[in-house]
Structures are given as C-alpha cells and as structure tokens.
C-alpha cells in the first residue's frame, strides 16, 4: 500500500466522549512492607496525562491537526489539570463541569517502568445530554470528522442524535465502541472495536473467514459504512461494503504498553480522513501509528515526525531515490534529529572511481548526503548530442546504491539553484579547482547562513574522457 503524510494542518476534528485524567506516581521500590506482603514505593515523581477522549484529542493535535473536544468533568483539581494539559497541547477543550461528581482519574503506581497498581476514582456521569448535543451541533460546521470516544462512563447518552446531526452535514462519524449493544452506533461511518469487543457482540471467530463473515453481517445490520477490527499482534482487518477485506499486519517492533493504543488508532484515522485521505490509506497510517505508541510507556501520543519516519520506513524512503516531496519530508525529519544536510550535484553519466571518492568526501562534511542529478534533457543541453549515455533513472539507481549517498533527486534545469532554494542544505559541496564564489548556487546557500565547500578532484578521472576513449575504439 502506497502511503504518504497527509496535510494534517488542514484537518479539523471534533472529539466527543468520556474524558479522564491518567495520573502516574513514579518511584523506587527496594523493600517489602512489614504490614503486608506488598512492595513499598517511595514516590519521586508525579505525572498527569490526558486520557480517554482527551487522549484522542491530544493525539490529533500532536499530529498537527486541529482538535476540538467536548466532554464532561467534575469541578475539581483533576479537571483543571486536564484543561491545562490540553490547552498547552493546542486542544480546544469545552467541558461540561458537574459540581457533584469527580473527574474520572486513573492512578497508576509505577516502579522501574513497571505498573504495580492501578486505582480508579470514578462515578458514572449524569450528563445533560441535551446541552451536550447543543454544544456538539454548534461545532460541526467547523470540522470535517466527528469522533465518538465512548468508554461507557456516561458522557455519551444519546449517540443517535450526534450521529444523525453529523450525517445531515455529510460529516463522517467514527466511533470507538464499548459495551454489549453496538446498535447505539447505528449509521456510523466507521466503528473500531478491538477483537475482544467485537467477539462480545458477534461471538468467537475461529478464523479470519468467520471474522469477515460476522463483520459483514454486523455492518449490514447496523447500517455501518465500514468496520475496523484491531487484533493486537495480528494487526487489523478493515471491512467495507462491496470491497474485499483488507488485512494489515501489526507493525510494532517492541511492545511495552498497550494503554491508549485504541485512542491512537481512531485519532490517526480521524485526522487522516479529515485531511482528505481515502479510508484504506488512513487505516494504513493508523496501523503504523499503533505500532509506534505500544512501544511507549503509559498513555502517550505520537508526533507527526514520528509517523513520518514510520511512513518513510514503510515506503523505503529512509534512503534512496526520492521525489521532491518525499525528500523535503526526509530532510525535515533529519533536521529534527540534529543532522547536518550536505548537497552536491552533477550529471554522473558514467560513474567512476573519481565519483565514488568525491562522494565519500562530500558525505564526510555532514550527516546526510543529497545528490542532485541533471535529468536527460538538461544533460543533453550541457554535454551535447549523444549524452547522456545512461538515462536519469539508471544514473540515480547507481548513485543510490553507494554507501555514502543517502538521497538522490533529479532536477530539470541546467543548474540546481531552484532545487537548492527548496532543499536549503547546511553545506553545498562541489569538486573542482575554482573558488567558492564560482560554485553555482553559492550565493543562495550563503544567504541563509549555509556553508559552501570545494573539494579536490581525483586525477585522471573524467566521464567525458572515458566516453571519448570508448568512442575512439
């Protein structure tokens, strides 16, 4: 499946559901209590993170999308902590605060990255469903996707009012379902149960064929647009009306904590769909995101750079021949990791030992080496009729195979100046015996604070001489 990073900055999403505070107490454990056979934790650090629907909104904002959140809290310190964390993350949160009930808090006691105990502070909310629906309907005009993040805690009382209000505006509705009655999600565009939740409704599935059959029957019964079953180490299965099932393998390299993985899936789906991605691509991105988040400890969000790196790995674009858009994403990610970008360019028609030595020297000037390659038409203009000997695709493929080269990109102009303005390398390198000011593009690079370096050429190594020698034979 071909994946690319969506324009998340053009993706407004509204999340409605059960918000909660995930609270962590971290400490050291070195002895057993004399009062009971339990470890004693000396608490050294307190940490609060948004949980439930708030974590969904946080994930959406972390991807660079616009996140709006409607939920229910108490009027207490936990609600204030939630509000402050969400505001700092760029989430537009609108809470229905209830004086007589506490904000839901999940307290986890941690030691050496292990969870020793969880304590829940919660009561089912008695929500003013009509007032909440009014808040939601007033925000629908501002968003492209509605997410119902349902943990069965009482914030969502009348799902159908919200689903029908969104459908009337042609806004897709995504629901992360809970409980034993999925009929409350009737008419949703997509629901995302995990395997356990799915089998609670349809019964145990002996194999994938049975899962698909039961899933399709459930979709028909509830008038669902699509169904995504998340299956842990077995990946995900997407079902759509009239389309074959799409099975995606799990992408996690290491699993440390599955807390909040479902939130990550639905948030990435929602943001991608709001950005204009088709559903299969959005699911592919969500699968990658889930593989990242389970490698983190506790409730966590993933960032756009993290997802971008995963996409690049998936598409094989960590190295090799890239289009300009892919290259710019790769550069952005490299810079986020403090890497110095080096650029050089040429025709590289017949690769020889001089080229290899020069490119190794160029790579040594920084952390990542980009090679800009003249396309065929520009080589002909520069070198004359009969050149290039090798097409641009073949020239780039050979360069990409060198260990010194990270990324190869072509350009159509006679000089790389336009490409340099977009790439903005930290170091521009050319080989020759002329001064820095004579290097094409030097003024562009120096204008934004970059460096220009001239490296010596390997003697008796010239493509033109090699071509002429071959012709004389």
From Swiss-Prot:
UniProt EC number: 2.7.1.167, 2.7.7.70
Chain residue ranges for the region called Cytidylyltransferase: 343-473
BP GO terms, sorted: ADP-L-glycero-beta-D-manno-heptose biosynthetic process
Active site: 263
Gene3D superfamilies noted in UniProt: 3.40.1190.20, HUPs
Pathway: Nucleotide-sugar biosynthesis; ADP-L-glycero-beta-D-manno-heptose biosynthesis; ADP-L-glycero-beta-D-manno-heptose from D-glycero-beta-D-manno-heptose 7-phosphate: step 1/4; Nucleotide-sugar biosynthesis; ADP-L-glycero-beta-D-manno-heptose biosynthesis; ADP-L-glycero-beta-D-manno-heptose from D-glycero-beta-D-manno-heptose 7-phosphate: step 3/4
Keywords: ATP-binding, Carbohydrate metabolism, Kinase, Multifunctional enzyme, Nucleotide-binding, Nucleotidyltransferase, Transferase
Keyword Nucleotide-binding applies: yes
Residues the record lists as binding ATP: 194-197
Annotated InterPro entries: Bifunc_HldE, Carboh/pur_kinase_PfkB_CS, Cyt_trans-like, PfkB_dom, RfaE_dom_I, RfaE_dom_II, Ribokinase-like, Rossmann-like_a/b/a_fold
Catalytic reaction list: D-glycero-beta-D-manno-heptose 7-phosphate + ATP = D-glycero-beta-D-manno-heptose 1,7-bisphosphate + ADP + H(+); D-glycero-beta-D-manno-heptose 1-phosphate + ATP + H(+) = ADP-D-glycero-beta-D-manno-heptose + diphosphate
CC annotations in GO: cytosol
Region (Ribokinase): 1-317
Subunit structure and binding partners: Homodimer.
Reported function: Catalyzes the ADP transfer from ATP to D-glycero-beta-D-manno-heptose 1-phosphate, yielding ADP-D-glycero-beta-D-manno-heptose.
Record-stated family: In the N-terminal section; belongs to the carbohydrate kinase PfkB family.
Descriptive protein name: Bifunctional protein HldE
Species this protein is from: Pseudomonas aeruginosa (strain LESB58)
Name of the encoding gene: hldE
């Amino acid at each position: 499946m071909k994946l690319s990073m969506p324009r998340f900055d053009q993706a407004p999403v509204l999340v409605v559901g059960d918000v909660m505070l995930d609270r962590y107490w971290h400490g050291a454990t070195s002895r057993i209590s004399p009062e009971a056979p339990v470890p004693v934790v000396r608490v050294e650090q307190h940490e609060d993170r948004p949980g439930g629907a708030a974590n969904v909104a946080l994930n959406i904002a972390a991807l660079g999308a616009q996140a709006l959140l409607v939920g229910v809290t108490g009027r207490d310190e936990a609600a204030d902590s939630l509000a402050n964390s969400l505001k700092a993350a760029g989430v537009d949160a609108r809470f229905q605060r209830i004086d007589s009930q506490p904000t839901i808090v999940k307290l986890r006691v941690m030691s050496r990255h292990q969870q020793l105990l969880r304590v829940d502070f919660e009561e089912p909310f008695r929500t003013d469903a009509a007032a909440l629906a009014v808040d939601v309907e007033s925000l629908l005009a501002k968003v492209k996707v509605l997410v119902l993040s349902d943990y069965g805690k009482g914030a969502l009382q009348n799902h159908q009012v919200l689903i029908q209000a969104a459908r009337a505006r042609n806004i897709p509705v995504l629901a992360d379902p809970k409980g034993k009655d999925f009929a409350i999600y009737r008419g949703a565009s997509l629901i995302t149960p995990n395997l356990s939740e799915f089998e609670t409704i349809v019964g145990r599935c002996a194999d994938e064929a049975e899962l698909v059959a039961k899933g399709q029957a459930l979709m028909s019964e509830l008038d669902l647009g699509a169904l995504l079953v998340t299956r842990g180490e077995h990946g995900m299965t997407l079902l759509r009306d009239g389309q074959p099932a799409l099975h995606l393998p799990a992408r996690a390299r290491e699993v440390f904590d599955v807390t909040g993985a479902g939130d990550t899936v639905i948030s990435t789906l929602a943001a991608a769909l709001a950005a204009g991605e088709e559903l299969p691509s959005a699911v592919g991105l969500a699968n990658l995101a889930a593989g990242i988040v389970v490698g983190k400890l506790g409730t966590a969000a993933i960032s756009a750079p993290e997802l971008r790196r995963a996409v690049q790995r998936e598409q094989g674009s960590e190295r090799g021949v890239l289009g300009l858009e892919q290259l710019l994403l790769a550069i952005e990610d490299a810079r986020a990791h403090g890497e110095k970008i080096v650029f050089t360019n040429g025709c590289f028609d017949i690769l020889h030992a001089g080229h290899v030595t020069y490119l190794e020297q160029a790579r040594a000037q920084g952390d990542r080496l980009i090679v800009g390659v003249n396309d065929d038409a520009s080589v002909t203009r520069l070198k004359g009729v009969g050149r290039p000997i090798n097409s641009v695709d073949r020239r780039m493929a050979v360069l990409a195979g060198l260990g010194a080269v990270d990324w190869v990109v072509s350009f159509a102009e006679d000089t790389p100046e336009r490409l340099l303005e977009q790439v903005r390398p930290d170091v521009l390198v050319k080989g020759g015996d002329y001064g820095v000011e004579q290097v094409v593009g030097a003024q562009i690079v120096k204008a934004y604070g970059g460096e220009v370096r001239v490296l010596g050429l390997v003697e008796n190594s010239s493509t033109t001489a090699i071509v002429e020698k071959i012709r004389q034979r």
